[in-house]
């Protein structure tokens, strides 16, 4: 890849990106560099579910990771970015069941083994789709190390962790209330339950006291669970019911006697202050039942139909039973009233059905000891660093209030629980391997929650439980995890405590938290709103580099991003600007050698010194911002340097030399252009891998790919404050004259007189020394630079730092319009002065900010005040002339 090729005349992202990824793969550029002296840097990709195509959130998440990986690779680190996918138990099984249902087939028709074969076929199909999407995004993943959560090695790790926790008493089997999906017929974790507002009602029911002395009124939204009531609860301090505690009521319709109990769980100010307690169908009621030793009566089957404990309602669907029970309560005089209301109801994320709280025998992880260990680790120098820091509070709050984790799922797709039951004795055996006399045992049919295996992802993918595995020793703990704030508890926290428990190390040094991708109106993207965006369609239109630029340059850690086609247009335009500027530079390089060395100071003119100083500052800023994960600010820094400094100013200034006759100056300018372009492409490469590779291959270079070229470094000798000061003054002057021309509709072809009234003496030397330079860019009829100049009566005026610019345009000047413009400028300057005054009056700023920063703000205020006086004076002159 060392010979350069000619760039096409137009930027076409499809042409640029097509085939490039395969070139990288063929060259094995995504693998670690295998240099034992290089410092390792590793990231494991958050494994996407094999349920379908990736969305914009995945594109954002993986682009941030790829930026880090590509930069570290260029900085000489031994880099590993490990890819993989998650089997996504219930999500994938639900998809396959839905597909089979279209053919009129259920999983039960196929049986467990054949159904799992169907799921593997699904996995292979969608894994191929995900691979294709990763390639189109340009992700530099080491596919030789790709993992899947059901791989043999990862399955070994899962069994070892389960057995170890079980032997420590941290995994147990018990009867508890869990979230239940009656369609999928499985337990759900909290994250698999989506809450939405449904229309419902409060049904007020009279429960008669058994002794005939009266009744007690309760209100419920779930009359279908009434057959499972085993008590009425009131608050111990509620005087209304004090004399009723200890008595009993007769359960309406069921004719069963249940006690009235006192429990602090009851809110005496809510509703009637009396609650029906159904321990088998509500988690809070379950806890109340435990405290009072109440029986647990389950009145529903797995499919949410009523069972024999529901009496005459046996066999009815739960919602049919609700109607029937309400009708019977009304007919028998127990129904007092019905108050319609809207309330939040949990629904299965995968099947959409209303979730039931169900009493079930499940496997659980005892969370308190593990959570305490994770919290204690956050007080050490081996803590996991959250970016932004505020998300550590989120993590801490969740860990301090954690409940035991139900890990069993009534599914077929997943890691089957390594527990067996003896067919004759019922004895339970838990182990990494099946019992030797397996014919006498039956394995637990449940599988583990998907989060159980993904909690082991950072170390199981590296070869653990073999702690001598080369990758585990070299690349674990990993350096950075990139993920969304919505799964801090469900995934991030579990990786932390499992890693600490089994490796005694944190799983990663930093967690970079990003937000959600929203539409232009700020709404979350969803199927129901129909506002989802397919990243592949965006790439087809704009290219991957433009999408990557949009996703990163507009992002701030922890904040959401709004997708916008207008911003995508801007991203494409920026790349097109880079393309055209690069093409101009390359077309003018001729036999210029590869820019492998920093340009020599003796060969630099003022513009060269300035652009190299600006480049040097950009390198320092972007490197620092990347280290702090401030990709949005890094993007803005790059944009300003490339668009403004390099393209709009330096290249335009370079043309004056390139089109001249001084061959030595031309050669020096060509080399400097090549050097700045080369360094700029390297800075851009982590975020725009395709177009930077294409341009780099088209210019003189050494090495096979920009991906393995060294990342730009700061060179102290390139810092040139004097050149920066001079060029900033010249640019301000040229820009001010151009603005005057634009406002007066005076094109460059029309010569104009220009007077520069110097107020800051050092400017005199700068402008005088560079008068020829100024004239080339402002095209004056005459140019006068002096102190004490008087503004012509009718002239356009521009105020720059240290000088006033007058352009006599009597025949073109609209006096009223100029007065209005200067009044606006006066208002703007007044706002800047007040802002600076407010900042300097803030002791928090003056006491804490570096003295250099405070002094810069004082200088700004003084400059604004001087400009204000100049504008005010000029305004008075024009008003007098009117």
Swiss-Prot record:
Q: Which SUPFAM superfamilies does the UniProt record give? A: Anticodon-binding domain of a subclass of class I aminoacyl-tRNA synthetases, Nucleotidylyl transferase, tRNA-binding arm, ValRS/IleRS/LeuRS editing domain
The answer, when asked if Hydrolase is one of the entry's keywords, is no
Coiled coil (residue ranges)? 809-882
Give the record's keywords alphabetically: Aminoacyl-tRNA synthetase, ATP-binding, Coiled coil, Cytoplasm, Ligase, Nucleotide-binding, Protein biosynthesis
Find motif ('HIGH' region) and give its ranges.
48-58
Q: What is its EC number?
A: 6.1.1.9
**Chief localization class?**
cytoplasm
Entries under CDD domains matching the protein: Anticodon_Ia_Val, ValRS_core
- Which catalytic reaction applies to this protein? tRNA(Val) + L-valine + ATP = L-valyl-tRNA(Val) + AMP + diphosphate
Biological process terms in GO annotation = valyl-tRNA aminoacylation
If you read the UniProt record, what top EC class would you report for this enzyme, in one word?
Answer: ligase
Q: Which domain of life is it from?
A: Bacteria
User: Record-annotated residues binding ATP?
Assistant: 527
Q: Which cysteines are joined by disulfide bonds?
A: none
- This protein is called Valine--tRNA ligase
- Organism source for this protein? Latilactobacillus sakei subsp. sakei (strain 23K) (Lactobacillus sakei subsp. sakei)
């Amino acid at each position: 890849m060392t010979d350069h090729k000619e760039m096409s005349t137009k930027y076409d992202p499809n042409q640029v990106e097509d085939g490039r990824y395969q070139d990288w793969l063929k060259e094995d550029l995504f693998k670690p560099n295998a240099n034992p002296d290089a410092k390792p840097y590793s990231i494991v990709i958050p494994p996407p579910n094999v349920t379908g195509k990736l969305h914009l959130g995945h594109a954002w998440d993986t682009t941030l990771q790829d930026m880090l990986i590509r930069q570290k690779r260029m900085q000489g680190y031994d880099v590993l970015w490990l890819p993989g996918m998650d089997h996504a138990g219930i999500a994938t099984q639900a998809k396959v069941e839905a597909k089979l249902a279209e053919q009129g087939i259920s999983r039960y028709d196929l049986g467990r083994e054949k159904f799992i074969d169907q799921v593997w076929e699904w996995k292979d199909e969608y894994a191929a789709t995900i691979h294709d999407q990763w390639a189109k995004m340009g992700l530099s993943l080491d596919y030789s190390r790709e993992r899947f959560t059901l791989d043999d090695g990862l399955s070994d790790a899962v069994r070892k962790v389960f057995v170890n926790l079980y032997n420590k008493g941290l995994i147990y089997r018990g009867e508890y209330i869990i979230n239940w999906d009656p369609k999928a017929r499985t337990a759900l974790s909290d994250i698999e339950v989506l809450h939405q507002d449904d229309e419902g009602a409060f049904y007020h029911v009279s429960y008669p006291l058994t002794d005939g002395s009266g009744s007690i009124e309760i209100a419920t939204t779930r009359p279908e669970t009434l057959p499972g009531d085993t008590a009425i609860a009131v608050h111990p301090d509620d005087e209304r019911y004090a004399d009723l505690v200890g008595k009993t009521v007769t359960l309406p319709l069921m004719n069963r006697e249940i006690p009235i109990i006192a429990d602090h769980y009851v809110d005496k100010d809510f509703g009637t202050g009396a609650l029906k307690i159904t321990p088998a169908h509500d988690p809070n009621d379950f806890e109340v039942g435990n405290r009072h030793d109440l029986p647990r009566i389950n009145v529903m089957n797995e499919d949410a139909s009523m069972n024999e404990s529901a009496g005459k309602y046996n066999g009815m669907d739960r919602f049919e039973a609700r109607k029937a029970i309400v009708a019977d309560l009304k007919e028998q005089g127990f129904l007092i009233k019905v108050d319609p209301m809207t309330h939040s109801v949990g629904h299965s994320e995968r099947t959409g059905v209303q979730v039931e709280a169900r009493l079930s025998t499940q496997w659980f992880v005892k969370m308190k000891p593990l959570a305490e260990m994770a919290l204690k680790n956050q007080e050490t120098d081996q803590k996991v660093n959250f970016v932004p820091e505020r998300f550590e509070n989120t993590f801490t709050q969740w860990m301090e209030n954690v409940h035991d984790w139900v890990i069993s799922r009534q599914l077929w797709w997943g890691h089957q629980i390594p527990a067996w039951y003896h067919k004759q004795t019922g004895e339970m055996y838990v182990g990494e391997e099946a019992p030797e006399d397996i014919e006498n045992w039956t394995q637990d049919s449940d599988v583990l929650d998907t989060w159980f295996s993904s909690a082991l992802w950072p170390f199981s993918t590296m070869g653990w439980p073999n702690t001598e595995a080369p990758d585990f020793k070299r690349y674990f703990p990993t350096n950075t995890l990139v993920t969304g704030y919505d799964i801090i508890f469900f995934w991030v926290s579990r990786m932390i405590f499992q890693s600490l428990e089994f490796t005694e190390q944190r799983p990663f040094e930093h967690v970079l938290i990003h937000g959600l991708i929203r539409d232009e109106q700020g709404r979350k993207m969803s199927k129901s709103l129909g506002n989802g965006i397919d990243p592949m369609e965006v790439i087809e239109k704009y290219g991957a580099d433009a999408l990557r630029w949009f996703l990163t340059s507009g992002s701030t850690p922890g904040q959401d991003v709004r997708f916008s086609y207008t911003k995508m247009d801007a991203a494409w335009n920026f790349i097109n600007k880079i393309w055209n500027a690069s093409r101009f530079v390359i077309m003018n390089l001729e036999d210029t050698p590869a820019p492998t060395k920093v340009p020599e100071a003796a060969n630099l003119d003022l513009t060269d010194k300035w652009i190299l100083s600006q480049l040097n500052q950009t390198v320092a800023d972007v490197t620092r911002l990347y280290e702090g994960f401030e990709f949005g600010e890094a993007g803005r820094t790059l944009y300003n340097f490339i668009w403004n400094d390099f393209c709009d100013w330096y290249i335009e200034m370079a043309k004056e030399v390139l089109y001249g006759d001084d061959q030595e100056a031309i050669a020096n300018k060509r080399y400097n252009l090549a050097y700045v372009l080369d360094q700029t492409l390297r800075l851009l490469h982590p975020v725009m891998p395709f177009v930077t590779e294409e341009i780099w291959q088209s210019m003189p270079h050494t090495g096979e790919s920009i991906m393995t070229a060294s990342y730009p470094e700061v060179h102290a000798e390139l810092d040139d404050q004097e050149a920066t000061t001079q060029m900033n003054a010249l640019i301000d002057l040229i820009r001010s004259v151009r603005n005057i021309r634009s406002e007066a509709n005076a094109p460059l072809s029309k010569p104009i007189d220009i007077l520069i009234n110097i107020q800051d003496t050092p400017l005199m030397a700068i402008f005088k020394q560079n008068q020829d330079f100024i004239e080339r860019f402002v095209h004056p009829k005459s140019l006068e630079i002096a102190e004490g100049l008087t503004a012509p009566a009718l002239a356009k005026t521009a105020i720059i730092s240290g000088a006033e610019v007058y352009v006599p345009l009597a025949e073109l000047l609209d006096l009223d319009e100029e007065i209005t413009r200067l009044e606006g400028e006066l208002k703007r300057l007044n706002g800047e002065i007040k802002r600076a005054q407010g900042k300097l009056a803030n002791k928090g700023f003056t006491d804490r900010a570096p003295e250099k920063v405070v002094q810069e703000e004082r200088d700004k205020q003084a400059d604004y005040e001087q400009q204000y006086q100049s504008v005010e004076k000029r305004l008075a002159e024009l008003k007098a002339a009117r």
